[in-house]
């Protein structure tokens, strides 16, 4: 599959008509497609639910997602779990917890600063051979996923 997978920050920037991002999107060849995965859309939905925000603005974002993003949504599949598992295993082996009794979530978040949703998004990009567009550093994840190309189009 050719194309790009947008992380949440790029989808939000797209909806906000970020000039740098829009210029890159408009310069893409017609056969290069831009996608978002279910995890990214879930993060946006969670953001809506966790804020009391402006309902008019929320509706505008939902309209944008329905028109431009949802038709290009990539679902999390049974195959995605394999890529997710490989990334998690690599993270664990690279920096195991000091104490065996430390939980996986605690170790990833508190020690490595890894957001589990980011692992899923990277797994989705890897599975489909897509370049991941993100502003997040994801340093520890990048260090264990040489198969994935990361780009930031918001600079």
Residue ranges: model-predicted function:
Residues 1-65, 92:
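Short, well-structured N-terminal submotif of metal-dependent ribonuclease cores
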Residues 10-11, 40, 80, 120-121, ...:
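Alpha-helix capping/helix-boundary segments
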Residues 18, 47-49, 87, 144-147:
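Short aromatic-enriched loop/helix-cap "lid" or pocket-rim segments at secondary-structure transitions
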Residues 31, 67-71, 128:
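Structured helix-beta-strand junction loops
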Residues 43, 83, 143:
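Phosphate- and divalent-cation-binding pockets in alpha/beta enzyme and binding domains
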Residues 46, 72-135:
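Active-site neighborhoods of divalent-metal-dependent phosphate/nucleic-acid chemistry enzymes
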Residues 70-77, 149-155:
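Short acidic-hydrophobic, aromatic-tinged amphipathic segments that line or gate anion-handling sites
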Residues 122-155:
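Acidic, PIN/NYN-like endoribonuclease modules and their adjacent C-terminal/linker elements
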């Amino acid at each position: 599959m050719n194309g790009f997978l947008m992380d949440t920050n790029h989808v939000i920037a797209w909806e906000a008509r970020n000039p740098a991002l829009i210029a890159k999107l408009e310069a893409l060849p017609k056969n290069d497609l831009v996608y978002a995965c279910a995890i990214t859309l879930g993060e946006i939905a969670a953001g809506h639910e966790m804020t009391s925000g402006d309902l008019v603005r929320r509706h505008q974002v939902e309209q944008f997602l329905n028109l431009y993003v949802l038709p290009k949504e990539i679902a999390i599949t049974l195959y995605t779990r394999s890529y997710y598992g490989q990334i998690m295993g690599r993270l664990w082996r690279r920096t195991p917890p000091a104490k065996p009794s430390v939980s996986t979530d605690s170790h990833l978040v508190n020690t490595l600063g890894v957001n589990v949703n980011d692992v899923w998004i990277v797994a989705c990009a890897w599975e489909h051979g897509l370049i991941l567009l993100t502003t997040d550093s994801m340093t520890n994840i990048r260090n264990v996923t040489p198969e994935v190309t990361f780009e930031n189009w918001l600079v």
